[in-house]
Amino acid sequence: DGKTIARYMGIDATTSDKCLSCHAPDAPVASGGRYKRSDGVTCEHCHGPAEQWLEAHSQRDWKQTRSQYLSRGFYDNNNYTLRARNCARCHVAIDHEIVAGGHPPLQFELVAYAQIMKHWDDQDELPKDAFSVDPTIWALGQITGLREALRMLSERAAGSNYQSLDQFAHFADRGCYQCHHKLVDDALRQARGHYLMVDAVLTGVAAGRRDELTGLWNGVVAAVPSNAAAAKQKADGMAGWLGTLEGQIGRIDQDATRRMLNRITSSGDRLKVAERFAFSQSKISNVVDLDNPSTPWWWTTGGPEQAYLAIRALCRPAVGERCDAAKNDLRTMLNAIDRFAYKPDQFAASIAAAGAKLK
């Protein structure tokens, strides 16, 4: 609940830029206009300030004329790469203070996000029998998600004590990580989920580049534990590489989609790993028993969650109605990735069972 989060943070959610930077359009409000920033997310947040194109948008010839309005505030979400960037700017990185206030964790997958209040059909823009665009949108979402997660990692690595909390005056003299885990670790875990999916993307469309991806990722992972400057450098370098890759992804066909799906469903043991910071518990701990008190609620299951969402996005384009045969396995998988009671072995078994039925 936004009001509760704001109260914990000591801010007004209807006026604070901490909230409105993502929950309101990024444009100045015209004097005397009817719109109020406190109205929250509206059409213009995703499509751009509409003053100079709204009337044209209602005309029959909009599809033929919309390119004329790109310089007048209209944001072209028909370009899948631009759409991914538009969504990722608010749905990947998150301010630690907001997390501490109770904001739910983010898990970015573009195809799933696009189903919420969906009011368009991408296939309408294509020939009648064209292959689904969902695999292409999924792939671009993962590449963009990884790039944004690496930028978050870079920012946190550059901050004082690996925390990037020095931007807040009340944290400036604190060494929070002496008692708490480093925030850069959270960014790394979030990035890992996207990295595993980008590996699957390259398996489908550019298998020869997987070694490049692995080398860059291993460099980031090696630098994070002890070298903030190197972690920032490696993260920035990999983010730049991904920016180039983003522009090289064309329409993904069914064969490539099947390769991506197979890579994911055959990698259960690799994907099931849910890394977390060191945790220990006193034998006389009074921790509330959520399921098993030795398993903290903050398990980050980025890889498993991304795998489940990926199968949902890719399955029907890849194998059609055969997806229905794996319905029960996917339900079991969803149950296994409950953040309050993650079951890695159940996840691995269910993804393998699903994969066997989808080959």
Where are the predicted features?
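General secretory precursor processing signal
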Residues: 22-25, 46, 90, 318, ...
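Mid-chain, structured segments of secreted extracytoplasmic proteins
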Residues: 2-32
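A cross-kingdom marker for long, charged
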Residues: 289-359
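Primarily the internal scaffold of c-type cytochrome electron-transfer domains
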Residues: 1-6, 31-41, 45, 49-302
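A broadly tuned preference for mixed-charge, low-complexity surface segments
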Residues: 13-25, 87-92, 223-230, 356-359
